[in-house]
């Protein structure tokens, strides 16, 4: 069994450059399709990032609606698995001491962040459908 795991690991490493390039291509496509939407803020990747997703801040509107969750729900209804970007450690029950300074910006925006898929298996037709749904729901 160890040989099988080793073979899988070697294959993944051999294709790493190809996978990163494919992910970056999808990030560029999201930037082209969603970059002009004033209801969204695409979080840029740092130079050399191998991020698996495109993180997007869905800017809240006036009122109490959770627009980011509406985007996630609409994508889920269309068959796409998308979720919030992260939950700050200090907000997880039992980990409230995992913050050394207050994080007002993170505390304010974390619930607005979602991750859009960028994996090599994501076809550009699906990427365009995802972008269309995100655009429509975020714009309202």
Predicted regions and their residues:
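PLP-dependent aminotransferase class I/II
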Residues: 1-140
């Amino acid at each position: 069994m160890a040989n099988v795991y080793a073979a899988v690991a070697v294959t993944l490493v051999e294709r790493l450059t190809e996978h990163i390039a494919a992910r970056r291509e999808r990030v560029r496509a999201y930037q082209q399709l969603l970059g002009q939407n004033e209801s969204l803020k695409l979080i840029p990747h740092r130079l050399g990032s191998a991020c698996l997703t495109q993180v997007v801040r869905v800017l809240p509107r006036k009122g109490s609606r959770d627009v980011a969750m509406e985007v996630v729900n609409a994508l889920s209804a269309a068959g796409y698995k998308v979720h919030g970007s992260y939950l700050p450690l200090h907000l997880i029950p039992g980990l409230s001491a995992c913050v050394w300074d207050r994080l007002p910006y993170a505390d304010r925006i974390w619930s607005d962040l979602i991750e859009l898929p960028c994996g090599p298996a994501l076809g550009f037709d699906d990427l365009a459908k995802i972008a269309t749904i995100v655009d429509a729901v975020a714009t309202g």
